[in-house]
Swiss-Prot record:
InterPro entries in UniProt: EF-Ts_dimer_sf, Transl_elong_EFTs/EF1B, Transl_elong_EFTs/EF1B_dimer, UBA-like_sf
Keywords recorded for this protein, A-Z: Cytoplasm, Elongation factor, Protein biosynthesis
Organism field: Leifsonia xyli subsp. xyli (strain CTCB07)
The keyword Lyase is assigned to this record: no
Predominant place of localization: cytoplasm
Molecular function GO labels: translation elongation factor activity
Cellular component, GO annotation: cytoplasm
HAMAP family recorded: EF_Ts (MF_00050)
CDD domains: UBA_EF-Ts
Record bears the keyword Protein biosynthesis: yes
Function: Associates with the EF-Tu.GDP complex and induces the exchange of GDP to GTP. It remains bound to the aminoacyl-tRNA.EF-Tu.GTP complex up to the GTP hydrolysis stage on the ribosome.
Name this polypeptide is given: Elongation factor Ts
Record-linked Pfam families: EF_TS
Family under the similarity heading: Belongs to the EF-Ts family.
Length: 276
């Protein structure tokens, strides 16, 4: 049996992020050859990937970057445990994946997974890294936001974890500070749409039926129902439409007013939260 040094075990663990016991066994099987031991560990991990296929991925991170063409790309990369999520290997993996997807201009999961990452596709690269880390890793979402400018905000819900919430805003105008504060507002308020006109008609009609039934059950006069319903629909739009919302920093102002005062126009946004 080859004499396996502590230095070799340490070097391979630092390179791959594998456990002490698995690393030592692989080196012993490879007769101390670091390259062969790496292949053994990757093969073992690849076999484990199939077994992990049905596992849930409720942890992970959100990452985003501004591109040279006036767009920004954002991804949610998921894993099984917060232990892996906060590790340097997983964060480095997300950086490589994000760079590859942004360079390819991918806008869908299918395009993103097929994007080149060195000599591999993103899907192959993630699979290899999952094999090493010993967890299921999943590219869950990707978004590309366009604008004259873009503002990016990444929020940590815990100092020990990478960003769990990410927002990208496409906008026109010169007030970068207000643009960033709008991104922060979106991370907190979680609007689903930009304007009330963007809310699907079936969603509005469903809400209209609900508030109508609630108003009737409260004994409101039939003659007053139309006005009451419109008022309650207004409250609904404040929840789901960004421009209708009260500004998180000053609830006397709506986002629409803040944008007007700062000379900004928002063209679109995306918000990701890990596991949501």
């Amino acid at each position: 049996m080859a004499n396996i040094s502590i230095a070799d075990i340490k070097a391979l663990r630092e390179q791959l992020g594998t456990g002490m016991v698995d690393t030592k066994k692989a080196l012993e099987e490879a007769g101390g050859d670091l390259e062969k031991a790496t292949e053994i560990l990757r093969l073992k991990g690849a076999k484990g990937n199939a077994k992990r296929a049905d596992r849930s991925t409720s942890e992970g991170l959100v990452a985003a970057k501004e591109n040279a063409n006036g767009t920004a790309t954002m991804i949610e990369l998921a894993c099984e445990t917060d232990f892996v999520a906060k590790g340097e290997k997983f964060v480095a993996l997300s950086d490589t994946v994000l760079d590859a997807i942004a360079a390819a201009g991918s806008t869908t999961i299918e395009e993103a997974l097929a994007a080149p990452a060195g000599s591999q596709t993103v899907a192959e690269f993630i699979g290899d890294e999952a094999a090493i880390l010993g967890e299921k890793i999943e590219l869950r979402r990707v978004a590309v936001v366009n604008g004259e400018h873009v503002a990016i905000y990444l929020h940590k819900t815990s100092k020990d974890l990478p960003p769990q919430v990410g927002v990208v805003v496409g906008y026109a105008g010169d007030d970068t500070e207000t643009a960033r504060s709008i991104a922060q507002h979106i991370s907190f308020a979680n609007p689903a749409h930009l304007t009330r006109e963007d809310v699907p008609a079936e969603e509005v009609e469903s809400e209209r039926r609900i508030v109508k039934e609630i108003s009737r059950s409260e004994g409101k006069p039939e003659a007053a129902l139309p006005k009451i319903i419109e008022g309650r629909l207004g409250a609904f739009f404040k929840q789901v439409a960004l421009l209708e919302q009260e500004y998180a920093r000053d609830n006397k102002l709506t986002i629409s007013q803040v944008l007007k005062d700062s000379g900004l126009t928002v063209s679109g946004f995306a918000r990701f939260k890990v596991g949501a």
